[in-house]
């Protein structure tokens, strides 16, 4: 049974580490993992004495050197519970029903520029009428300056009154009394004191926003207050989520910049909110989000291209400094996300390491990579159910490896799936066409093929000395 003196020893270690300005990321992560495991596994254990729980809470509060932190961390023994914050509703109508997606924005007063209104406008303008029924937007005006908040609320209500009335837009504020100490914090990474205060408060801003949004929808996407959206971004997100049904994931990424476009299950938001609060002064928010993903056992980044969200602010919310970061994978105009129906994939090519066949068929930014193929080698997709295909697009090679394309190949479609000892396969194939410069694209397939398609096959027509990357296979169905 877990002894309290062991827990006390852990806190002593943590206390010593707090005095070290220069410490490795590895040591921090080690302590972080141990701390979370003990807190989550042992404090939740029904056999831990209530008195010990109280001592643990008092010790953790002392470690954070903040009497005002007691109410925030009183529920550490239940990471799935909500943080006790009484929010101020600055502009909102009661949420009548749970939505599919909540879009969360946190905003503070900037020394230069203000992009919040443009961001909200982009969210609504880039969504169809049907999509608007499935989203809610929550704006956390997190600045402690009440005059600025009042002015922003007036602007928001004037421009987006109908969205507020429809329950699609809520503007909230978490009062300053709920915040931990923000002055005199540790200067990790030799950051200046004002930057440490800024990023630490930002972590708490987002923690309170996540806490509020935990029950408003099935999924939650995190944006900044200076972002432009792609057309019909919700439809694209829904297709991606559907394609990952049955797959474990914690975070899906729809932008490669900071914490823009990070998507979560809403049931994970309470844990994430607690996590940001616990380590609010340790590091920037995007770093903490990466650690959170890893602690919940999602090893690899799952990012999708093209990006759905673009950073548009020129001046940073920190000191008004210039911030010219852009996501070069962003596409603003509507793009057609493929359907890629459920299928099994196999190849007789020599696969390199873990670049397996399935990665070419996924929406994730990954690919298949094989050693030089020979005449007659195949890459086969067998669909779970017969489909009618409208369009096919296959791309090989990458920008970095432009020679690793299919130099000589064809694309076939098949019918009459036959069972076999090793795998299902089609008995007959019909050739649709040849690859040109490593790519294949054809529309109107359903007008050319007289049967429902059971299989699709990439066929190597000539041996090549170059390796082969199949970057993406996209299929649109009728």
UniProtKB/Swiss-Prot annotation:
Transmembrane segments: 24-44
A GO cellular component entry from the record: Golgi membrane
Membrane association type: Single-pass type II membrane protein
Cofactor(s) the protein needs: a divalent metal cation
Pathway: Protein modification; protein glycosylation
Record keyword Glycoprotein present: yes
Molecular function as annotated in GO: alpha-1,3-mannosylglycoprotein 4-beta-N-acetylglucosaminyltransferase activity; metal ion binding
Coiled-coil residue spans: none
Listed GO biological process terms: protein N-linked glycosylation
Keywords on record: Glycoprotein, Glycosyltransferase, Golgi apparatus, Membrane, Metal-binding, Signal-anchor, Transferase, Transmembrane, Transmembrane helix
Function field: Glycosyltransferase that participates in the transfer of N-acetylglucosamine (GlcNAc) to the core mannose residues of N-linked glycans. Catalyzes the formation of the GlcNAcbeta1-4 branch on the GlcNAcbeta1-2Manalpha1-3 arm of the core structure of N-linked glycans. Essential for the production of tri- and tetra-antennary N-linked sugar chains. Does not catalyze the transfer of GlcNAc to the Manalpha1-6 arm to form GlcNAcBeta1-4Manalpha1-6 linkage ('GnT-VI' activity).
Protein name as catalogued: Alpha-1,3-mannosyl-glycoprotein 4-beta-N-acetylglucosaminyltransferase C
The species this protein was found in: Macaca fascicularis (Crab-eating macaque)
């Amino acid at each position: 049974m877990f002894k309290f003196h062991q827990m006390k020893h852990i806190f002593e270690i943590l206390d010593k580490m707090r005095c070290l300005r220069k410490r490795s990321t590895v040591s921090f992560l080690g302590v972080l993992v141990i701390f979370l495991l003990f807190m989550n596994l042992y404090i939740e254990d029904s056999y831990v004495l209530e008195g010990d729980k109280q001592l643990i809470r008092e010790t953790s509060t002392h470690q954070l050197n903040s009497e005002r932190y007691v109410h925030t961390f009183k529920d550490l023994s239940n990471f799935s519970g909500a943080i006790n914050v009484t929010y101020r509703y600055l502009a909102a109508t009661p949420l009548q029903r749970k939505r599919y997606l909540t879009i969360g924005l946190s905003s503070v007063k900037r020394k230069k520029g203000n992009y919040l209104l443009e961001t909200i406008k982009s969210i609504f303008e880039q969504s169809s009428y049907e999509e608007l029924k499935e989203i809610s937007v929550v704006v956390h005006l997190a600045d402690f300056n009440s005059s600025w908040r009042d002015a922003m609320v007036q602007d928001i209500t004037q421009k987006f009154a109908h969205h507020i009335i429809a329950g699609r837009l809520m503007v909230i504020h978490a009062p300053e009394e709920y915040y931990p100490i923000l002055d005199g914090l540790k200067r990790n990474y030799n950051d200046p004191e004002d930057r440490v205060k800024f990023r630490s408060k930002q972590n708490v801003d987002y923690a309170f926003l996540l806490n509020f949004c935990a029950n408003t929808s099935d999924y939650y996407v995190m944006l900044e207050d200076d972002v432009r959206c792609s057309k019909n971004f919700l439809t694209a997100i829904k297709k991606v989520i559907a394609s990952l049904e049955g797959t474990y994931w914690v975070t899906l990424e729809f932008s490669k910049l900071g914490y823009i476009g990070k998507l979560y299950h809403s049931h994970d938001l309470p844990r994430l909110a607690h996590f940001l609060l616990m380590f609010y002064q340790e590091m920037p928010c995007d770093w903490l989000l990466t650690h959170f993903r890893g602690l919940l056992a999602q090893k690899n980044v799952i990012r999708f291209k093209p990006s759905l969200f673009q950073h548009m602010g020129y001046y940073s919310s920190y000191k008004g400094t210039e911030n010219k970061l852009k996501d070069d994978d962003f596409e603003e105009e509507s793009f057609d996300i493929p359907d890629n129906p459920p299928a099994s994939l196999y190849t007789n090519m020599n696969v390199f390491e873990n670049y397996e066949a399935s990665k070419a068929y996924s929406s994730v930014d990954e690919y298949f990579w094989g050693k030089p193929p020979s005449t007659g080698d195949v890459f086969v997709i067998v669909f779970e159910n017969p489909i009618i295909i409208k369009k096919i697009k296959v791309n090989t090679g990458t920008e970095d490896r432009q020679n690793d394309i299919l130099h000589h190949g064809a694309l076939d479609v098949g019918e009459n799936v036959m069972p076999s000892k090793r795998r299902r396969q089609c008995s007959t194939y019909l050739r649709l066409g040849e690859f040109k410069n490593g790519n294949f694209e054809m529309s109107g397939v359903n007008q050319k093929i007289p049967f429902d398609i059971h299989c699709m096959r990439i066929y190597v027509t000539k041996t090549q000395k170059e390796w082969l990357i199949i970057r993406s296979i996209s299929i649109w169905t009728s």
